[in-house]
Amino acid sequence: MLQRAGKLYVAHWKAFRICKKNEFASITNDATLKSVCLGPPQNDPKGLINRELSRLDDKVAKKCVKAGVTPVGAQFPGLCTGASDATFADCVAARVACRFCQSVNRADAILPPLNCDTFDDGVSNASCSP
């Protein structure tokens, strides 16, 4: 699970880098960087993020649910502990998106920073603090 979550995090960065490279001429400030490459939803021209999301879903289904390791969330400490088997991968994906958002805000010194609370799961629900 940790390996798949790590690969999803890397996919977020790769998609961001590809977008910045492809849209370099049109990105003139932080506002256009956010709207063009970060959304939400994040621009993913090669489908890297969706591919890793599918792999994470498959990993949960094959290695945990089919193996009888349920509830999956109870096996992992943290914010996803209470997630059902069906929503566990989505919860992990939201946590990864939150960490990516916080990291990209710092790494690119984005001002004003991207709202990570809406970036992680599309909802303003205090699930990702700055």
Give the residues covered by each predicted segment.
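Soluble, non-transmembrane alpha-helical interaction regions
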Residues: 1-130
